[in-house]
């Protein structure tokens, strides 16, 4: 009985729509474009944003038509089913739509090529359904609904995720997007706080709060190494402006930043010939006497006796093209150099 009702409902969706042939023709056009252009074949022409313009136009038409028809056709569930069919036709596309107030927001992942993926916002313009704006960044887009701004304007968070490394680290950009009349604009972005790149291990967006666990930059930080310091920051909405305020949270493996700060002071003292500072870092005068002024840090991972709470750590260095090993030992909250010497071949 239920299956029969579902079939009747499906038939109604096809026959009751004012121009039922439209979506079928549009889907066929989409399939033809996907086959003919061989997108993602690695050529510069096949990976450019312009190559996807016609495909985006078809998807925009599909969504705008459904929103204009209204009723069940304008529901998130119906639109998602239709867009899933387009995604299956292309194979490489993934489209997710979410309702944000009176807006319909879509996250379109069409390719791994830079600048191709987009977030597209649909709503009413002059009383008609329309595409209001698009955002395009590098990475895979994910849309999270957000509480309205103090004045009631609709908002959402757009996350742009890069590909994960073998260690589970990925580039991330977060944008808070707010409706302003018939337009939308980014009112806050993580790129303002992290202009180079925000490399995260994990993040979450829920209940008016964003948590981000990432690798901060500091002297001695070496990308790709285990056991380095990670920070967890919390972003919450400011009551007055509705934009996000950063609140520092906990640190993981804080010992590595402290160790590397000690190592940096050691290298600086050697380069400057600062014997007083050197004596505070190296208690043994014989070890101090062996250290060359040309000693510099080497871009290699540290060797610690524990990744979470080490007592001794070996740090790689170099002097006049000769590799050195520096052994630091923790005494309370301080790190001191207790052994040093060239690495024999």
Located regions from the model:
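Short beta-strand elements that form the blades of beta-propeller/WD-repeat-like
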Residues: 102-111, 153-164, 208-219
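Terminal domain-start segments
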Residues: 16-126, 130-135, 275-276
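Bacterial N-terminal signal peptides that target proteins for export
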Residues: 1-3
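Repeat-based blade/solenoid architectures
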Residues: 77-90, 135-146, 193-200, 257-258
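Extracellular C-terminal loop/segment signatures of secreted glycoproteins
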Residues: 122-145, 172-194
């Amino acid at each position: 009985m239920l299956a029969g009702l579902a079939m009747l409902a499906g038939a109604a969706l096809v026959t009751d729509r004012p121009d039922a042939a439209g979506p079928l023709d549009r889907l066929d056009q989409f399939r033809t474009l996907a086959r003919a252009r061989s997108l993602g074949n690695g050529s510069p022409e096949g990976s450019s944003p312009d190559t996807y313009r016609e495909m985006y136009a078809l998807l925009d038409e599909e969504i705008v038509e459904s929103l204009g028809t209204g009723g069940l056709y304008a529901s998130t569930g119906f639109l998602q089913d239709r867009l899933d069919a387009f995604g299956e036709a292309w194979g490489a596309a993934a489209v997710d739509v979410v309702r944000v107030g009176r807006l319909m927001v879509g996250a379109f992942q069409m390719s791994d090529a830079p600048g191709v993926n987009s977030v597209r916002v649909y709503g009413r313009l002059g009383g008609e359904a329309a595409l209001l704006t698009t955002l395009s960044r590098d990475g895979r887009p994910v849309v999270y609904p957000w509480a309205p701004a103090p004045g009631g304007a609709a908002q959402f968070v757009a996350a742009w995720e890069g590909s994960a490394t073998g260690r589970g680290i990925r580039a991330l950009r977060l944008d808070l997007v707010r409706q302003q009349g018939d337009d939308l604009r980014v009112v806050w972005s993580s790129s303002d706080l992290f202009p180079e790149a925000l490399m995260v291990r994990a993040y979450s967006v829920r209940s008016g709060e964003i948590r981000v666990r990432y690798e901060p930059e500091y002297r001695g930080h070496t990308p790709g190494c285990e056991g380095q310091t990670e920070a967890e920051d919390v972003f919450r909405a400011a009551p007055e402006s509705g934009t996000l305020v950063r609140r520092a949270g906990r640190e993981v493996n804080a010992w590595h930043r402290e160790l590397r700060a000690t190592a940096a002071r050691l290298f600086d003292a050697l380069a400057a010939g600062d014997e007083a500072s050197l004596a505070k870092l190296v208690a043994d005068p014989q070890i101090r006497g062996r250290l060359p002024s040309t000693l510099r840090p080497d871009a290699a991972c540290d060797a610690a006796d524990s990744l979470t709470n080490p007592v001794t750590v070996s740090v790689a260095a170099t002097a006049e093209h000769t590799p050195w090993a520096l052994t630091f030992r923790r005494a309370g909250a301080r790190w001191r150099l207790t052994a040093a010497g060239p690495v024999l071949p």
